[in-house]
């Protein structure tokens, strides 16, 4: 039978799982105009408020004046500019690694790195709640693919003990994007070491946010390159720009340049984006008060949510999901918040497990106390108290 997209769409809509795009008509900020209506934005990943920072915007403009818009080719042809190279060196220094390598997106970084490091005859071990890009990398690598219970180092240890593969790659998020919890990295690092496995961490939601200097989840736990030899980070969240990178040893990066297909066979990022990111990285390092303000905002929101009876886990970062349950109920809560002037997305399967649809609330250093208090007041009216 020929595939019928219309029938498939009807089935998605019947499950309240249909997703649609909304049109943003303003820069990313705590206040945005979306579909023609002003909203206070509590669903962006712009954790430090850098996406619309004047210095970052100015660096982008200067980059366009210096480099033009497009890079013109892949990094290995003629698209690797001095701006790209300088950013890679600065990211390597920031993460405490000998080298770093830019990728066009976080999805491409994860897909490329996992599939380059593991293949037929190897085994990839992944947390069940890893980001889709990590899971897809494992599935498409050709390696045997095993998923262990979420944040369960003992389950990973048992899986490694059963493996006879010569090459073993353990892959985890640092901060889980839909749940906001941290991977137990010290335990995972010990298990990976004892199990003769590489450990790869995607710190998309930890970089810039966690740790005294914003170096991410590894800094938060006091870990470094010996424990986590493969580190992936994104530029499109706390750093406020676009793209991603992997940081590691000289030999790792040189190998990925040769073998990571999502690096080799795609056009390089616009050099102006690299110039803007160099400035945002400098701001991350020179303005620790942004992280402190974010922590204060997270504490304020969590205290208010607890006083309203909402159950939140032990989540130290800006991702504070409120699990609703049914798809229709999450959509209705999001709609009610919109009526009160707040933008909070309803996250539904397949992004999260069935029966755990949620409001994914994200805090920014740029949010004011008044905006946070207003959201809490709106949540009290929009969300059932048993959530």
From Swiss-Prot:
The keyword Cell wall biogenesis/degradation belongs to this UniProt entry's keyword annotation: no
Binding site for pyridoxal 5'-phosphate: 106-107, 177, 205, 234
Keywords: Biotin biosynthesis, Pyridoxal phosphate, Transferase
Keyword Ribonucleoprotein: no
CDD domains: KBL_like
Record-listed N6-(pyridoxal phosphate)lysine modification sites: 237
EC category name: transferase
Family: Belongs to the class-II pyridoxal-phosphate-dependent aminotransferase family. BioF subfamily.
Protein name: 8-amino-7-oxononanoate synthase
Organism this protein belongs to: Methylococcus capsulatus (strain ATCC 33009 / NCIMB 11132 / Bath)
Gene that produces this protein: bioF
């Amino acid at each position: 039978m020929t595939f019928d997209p219309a029938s498939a769409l009807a089935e998605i809509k019947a499950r309240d799982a249909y997703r649609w795009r909304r049109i943003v008509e303003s820069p990313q900020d705590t206040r945005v105009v979306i579909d023609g209506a002003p909203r206070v934005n509590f669903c962006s990943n712009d954790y430090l408020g850098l996406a619309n920072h004047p210095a970052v915007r100015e660096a982008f403009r200067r980059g366009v004046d210096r480099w033009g818009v497009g890079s013109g080719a892949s990094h290995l042809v003629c698209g690797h500019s001095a701006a790209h190279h300088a950013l890679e060196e600065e990211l390597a220094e920031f993460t405490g690694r000998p080298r770093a390598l830019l990728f066009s997106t976080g999805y491409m970084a994860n897909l490329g790195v996992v599939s380059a490091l593991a293949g037929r005859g190897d085994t990839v071990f992944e947390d069940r709640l890893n980001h889709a890009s990590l899971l897809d990398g494992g599935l498409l690598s050709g390696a045997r693919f095993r998923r262990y219970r979420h944040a369960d180092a003992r389950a990973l240890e048992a899986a490694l003990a059963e493996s006879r593969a010569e090459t073993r790659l353990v892959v985890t998020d640092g901060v889980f994007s839909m749940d906001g919890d941290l991977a137990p990295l010290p335990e995972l690092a010990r298990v990976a070491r004892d199990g003769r496995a590489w450990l790869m961490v995607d710190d998309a939601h930890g970089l810039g946010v966690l740790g005294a200097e914003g170096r991410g989840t590894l800094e938060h736990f006091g870990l470094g390159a010996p424990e986590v030899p493969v580190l992936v980070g994104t530029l499109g969240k706390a750093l406020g720009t676009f793209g991603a990178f992997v940081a590691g040893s000289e030999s790792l990066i040189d190998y990925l340049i040769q073998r990571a297909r999502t690096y080799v066979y795609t056009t390089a990022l616009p050099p102006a984006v690299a110039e803007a990111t160099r400035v945002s990285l400098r701001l991350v390092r020179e303005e620790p008060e942004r992280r402190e303000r974010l922590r204060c905002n997270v504490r304020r929101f969590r205290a208010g949510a607890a006083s309203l009876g909402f159950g939140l886990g032990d989540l130290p970062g800006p991702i504070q999901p409120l699990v609703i349950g049914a798809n229709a109920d999450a959509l209705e809560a999001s709609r009610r918040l919109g009526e009160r002037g707040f933008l909070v997305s309803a996250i539904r399967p397949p992004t999260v497990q069935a029966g755990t649809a949620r409001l994914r609330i994200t805090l920014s250093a740029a949010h004011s106390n008044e905006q946070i208090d207003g959201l809490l007041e709106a949540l009290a009216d929009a969300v059932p108290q048993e959530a």
